[in-house]
Amino acid sequence: MRNLAVFGTASDVGKSVVATALCRIFSNAGLDVAPFKAQNMSNNSGVTPDGLEMGRAQIVQAEAARVVPTADMNPVLLKPNTDTGAQVVLQGKAVANRSARDYFGNTEVWAEAAFESLERLTGRHDLVVIEGAGSCAEMNLYDRDFVNFRTAKEADAPVILVADIDRGGVFAQVAGTLSVIPPEDRARVKGVIINRFRGDSVLFDDGIRILEELSGVPVLGVIPYFRGIHIEAEDAVPLQAVVDPAASPDPGKISIAIVYFPHISNFTDFAVFDLLDDAEVHYLHHPKDLADYDAVILPGSKNVRGDLDWMIFMGWKERLAEYRKRGGIIAGICGGYQMLGISVADPHGLEGEPGETSGLGLLPVHTLLKKEKQLFNAKGCLFDDTIPVEGYEIHMGETRLTGKASPLLQLTARNNRHSSDTDGVISHDEKVFGTYFHGIFDGSAFRGWFLGKLRPDSAVNDTITEKDTEYNRLAEHFLSHLNMGKVYEIIGRGK
């Protein structure tokens, strides 16, 4: 059995979704398949069962493949924390902050670790679906790019090239990519997938013929643009998300406003709300009258003090204070929780210049950023209650309660070890709360508690069932439009 690589003509052409679909298709066919991406750049990350950090996109692909996610599936994770720099997570552990220039100055250390992980994966699974990064033909970085063709060569993997017809110029995308890469890499490209087609695909039959004549590579499928299949986005708030809407929230739905920080992270915490027919989420850059929203959530941030400064500059502090006075419900997750407090101190300069920044003052807590990152899968229940909660923690802050409020959660386990710690804080009137738990809304019990505070008649879906259903729907969509017989031929397995 050969491995298979999915590369793109550009960023955001749909590589992650194609890889996710293939993982579920191969899994449904009875194959032991695993995902792999040598290097991912994203602030959406999760924690593996053994307490290591990896990109959410590969966790999603592992779920689609029905395998336990491991850090080997995403050995290098870059988490941008400034416009020109990022925290480097190597095989699940944060090792350094690097500027782009420093990182690309010597990529061999990262490549070596990535290929170690790849070797372990290929030894454990029948098939590895490899996702590339960005464009596979960035010629100015080609000699330092270990994520695309160098990984394909290491895995002896044929390549499927994904192009996005929705953005236009699909012929130039494919022909241009294939014309600039070296002949030995071009020879690895065995098929093309045209993604996000709108309209009657029969009208593109001539386009398929022209593409195949131009490239000498078969078109394996034309995948129609789809809506209504909910798969977590990889590294940006999805384009279909409602950002800064001119219209007010729908009064017939539960309306949740999420503050869209410049350095927002783990916005996938809120993907579950997209599965609720009677809920809508608005991502807001700009402050507005919040009176019509049932709740406001401050998400995670990869630069808490920087985003705090941004919020104050934009006028968010005053808007949230007004909303609080009117009895609005405000929640903070991880970095958002830290912002709700009195202050955030960074004496080591982990996220910028050393110093301390005043918070929003909505919870009586102080946060100190420390050098060691905390990575936990955790379980517990609401404090003084039996409502179960699960989530994962990824933070470098230690937050102390210093005033009149109560812990939000009573923990029972962290990384499968007993814990009697508490997490988070909730105000005495239960209108403002914060927690370090990412994924907390995925649990139906906690989600029901939260939605019940907003509107008592809120319906609750089962997230796990929904997720599996969505992966199967995605696989069915691709199976209807993809020549899987040719794909199996490409990987050396007749079907």
Swiss-Prot record:
Residues 253-446 form the GATase cobBQ-type domain. One of its GO terms (biological process) is cobalamin biosynthetic process. Keywords: Cobalamin biosynthesis, Glutamine amidotransferase. The keyword Cell division does not apply. Coiled coil: none annotated. One of its GO terms (molecular function) is ABC-type vitamin B12 transporter activity. Disulfide bonds: none annotated. The keyword Transport does not apply. The active site is at C334 (nucleophile), H438. Pathway: Cofactor biosynthesis; adenosylcobalamin biosynthesis. Pfam families: CbiA, GATase_3. InterPro entries: Class_I_gatase-like (IPR029062), CobQ/CobB/MinD/ParA_Nub-bd_dom (IPR002586), CobQ_GATase1 (IPR033949), CobQ_N (IPR047045), CobQ_synth (IPR004459), GATase_3 (IPR011698), P-loop_NTPase (IPR027417). Catalyzes amidations at positions B, D, E, and G on adenosylcobyrinic A,C-diamide. NH(2) groups are provided by glutamine, and one molecule of ATP is hydrogenolyzed for each amidation. Belongs to the CobB/CobQ family. CobQ subfamily. This is Cobyric acid synthase. It comes from Chlorobium phaeobacteroides (strain BS1). The lineage of its organism: Bacteria, Pseudomonadati, Chlorobiota, Chlorobiia, Chlorobiales.
